[in-house]
Every structure is written in C-alpha cells, then in structure tokens.
C-alpha cells in the first residue's frame, strides 16, 4: 500500500524511449532474422525445411544388431584414427631427421688435422704489445727484448725492522742457520734478510767512518803482489838494493 500510494501521489514520470524503428534506421539495432525471436529448441530437433524426409522405408533394428554395429563402427573409427595419427607422426619425424645436420667426413678430417685452429677460433689469447710491458730503465734501450723486469724493493714493516736491528746489535754477521731462523720468524726470505744485513753493515761503516772492507782487501792484495815482484827480481849487479820509488 505504501509503495502504491507513493507511486500515485508522487510526480514520478515513466521514461519514454523512441520506437525500435528509429534504432533500426540509425543502425543501433542490427536486423535479425525471424528465427532469432523464436523459442529455443532441443538440440535433437530437426527442422523439416532444413532436413527433408526421405522416401525410403526405415529398417527395423534390434538391440543385438545395434550393439554389434556400434562395436564395428567404433573399431573401424579407432583403426582409422590410429592410422591417421601414425601417418601424421611419421612425416614429422622424417622432417625432424632431415633438419638435423650431419657432419661430413671431410669436415671431421679437417677438425682432426687442425685442432689448434679450432682452439684459436674458440678462445683467442690477448695480444701483448711491447709498449704494454713494464721497463725499469732510465733510458730507452732499443735492444731490449722484454725480459725479466727489475725486482721491486721490499717494504719492511716496523716490527720486522725492529727485530732485525736487535739482531744486528748483537751480531753484525749471521750464519746461514741463524739467517734461516730469522727469515722464518719474520716471514721473510733468506735473500731479503741477507740483503738487509749487507745494507745495514754499509750504513754502520759509513756512520763510524771506517774504510770499506772491499777497498781494504783490494789495496792489501796489490801491496802483496808488489812485494812478490821485488823479491822475485833479486839483487842488482851493482850491489845496491832496489829503490821502492823506482818500482
């Protein structure tokens, strides 16, 4: 009652739509066939106009005949389908086999004869030019062939220098056994310990203004050679002794 009274008393106006003809003229609604508006039918329904009735009489069927014919039809269909599937698969396999390239004996023989060429094509070694090599010389030597570079200087740590100074304070010359022990203790090579002690001895002699040991040994060897020459000459005929200044 409330809804009906509301609709009667209210100023509600029903919407007015244009007729379908205007929509069809403006191509809003496509024209449909009369079958479009008919009731839906079962899928088993056959229209008389589409499927005309045949004139020959329909044969009678029994349950056994229907079952036997059905089995035969199914077997025939399955046989036909299996043959069709086999025929479809066989050309595909043939196509796949044809696509795969086959290595000819000529190519195999070439690869066997030239394994180095095949490796070169796979991985090329980087080219090192002469200007890329490090040269530790003051002037450019044209005859330099890029041999072993100059050894870099060893950077001793403070702990290593302290231990070497302690050892030098007690022993300026090391035996081979002691040198090996120090090298193992300080994680250095025997050569590095030997060079450090040589440089430290040179510095100590320079600080104490002592003559170089090598220069002293050279001068002593020259004096001994002179003495041997004088003694080998013997006395002169006039009986005078040889003068050292004349020699």
From Swiss-Prot:
Record keyword Transcription present: yes
Gene3D superfamilies: Homeodomain-like (1.10.10.60)
Biased composition (Low complexity): 217-233
SUPFAM superfamilies (UniProt xref): Homeodomain-like
GO molecular-function term, one example from the UniProt record: RNA polymerase II cis-regulatory region sequence-specific DNA binding
Cellular compartments per GO CC: nucleoplasm
One GO term (biological process): positive regulation of transcription by RNA polymerase II
A Pfam family assignment: Homeodomain
Chain spans, region Disordered: 206-247
Keywords: Developmental protein, DNA-binding, Homeobox, Nucleus, Transcription, Transcription regulation
Localization in the cell: Nucleus
Keyword DNA-binding attached: yes
DNA-binding region(s) in UniProt: 149-208
Motif (Antp-type hexapeptide): 128-133
Chief localization: nucleus
SMART domains linked to this entry: HOX
Family membership: Belongs to the Antp homeobox family. Deformed subfamily.
Database matches in PANTHER family: HOMEOBOX PROTEIN HOX-A4, HOMEOTIC PROTEIN DEFORMED
Protein purpose: Sequence-specific transcription factor which is part of a developmental regulatory system that provides cells with specific positional identities on the anterior-posterior axis.
Name this protein carries in UniProt: Homeobox protein Hox-A4
Taxonomic source organism: Heterodontus francisci
């Amino acid at each position: 009652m409330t809804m009906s009274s509301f609709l009667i008393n209210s100023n509600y106006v029903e919407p007015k739509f244009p007729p379908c003809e205007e929509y069809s003229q403006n191509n809003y609604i496509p024209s449909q066939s009369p079958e479009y508006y008919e009731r839906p039918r079962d899928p088993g329904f056959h229209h008389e106009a589409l499927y005309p009735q045949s004139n020959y009489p329909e044969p009678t069927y029994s349950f056994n005949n229907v079952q036997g014919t059905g089995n035969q039809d199914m077997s025939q269909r399955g046989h036909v389908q299996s043959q069709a599937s086999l025929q479809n698969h066989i050309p595909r396999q043939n196509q796949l086999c044809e696509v795969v390239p086959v290595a000819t004996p000529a190519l195999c023989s070439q690869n066997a004869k030239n394994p180095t060429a095949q490796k070169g094509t796979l991985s090329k070694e980087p080219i090192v030019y002469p200007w890329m090599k490090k040269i530790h010389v003051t002037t450019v030597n044209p005859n330099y062939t890029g041999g072993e570079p100059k050894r870099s200087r060893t950077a001793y740590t403070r702990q290593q220098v302290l231990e070497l100074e302690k050892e030098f304070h007690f022993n300026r010359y090391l035996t081979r056994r002691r040198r090996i022990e120090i090298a193992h203790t300080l994680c250095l090579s025997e050569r590095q310990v030997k060079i450090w002690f040589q440089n430290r001895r040179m510095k100590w002699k320079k600080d104490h203004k002592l003559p170089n040991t090598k220069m002293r040994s050279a001068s002593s060897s020259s004096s001994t050679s002179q003495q041997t020459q004088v003694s080998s000459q013997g006395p002169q005929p006039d009986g005078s002794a040889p003068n050292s200044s004349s020699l």
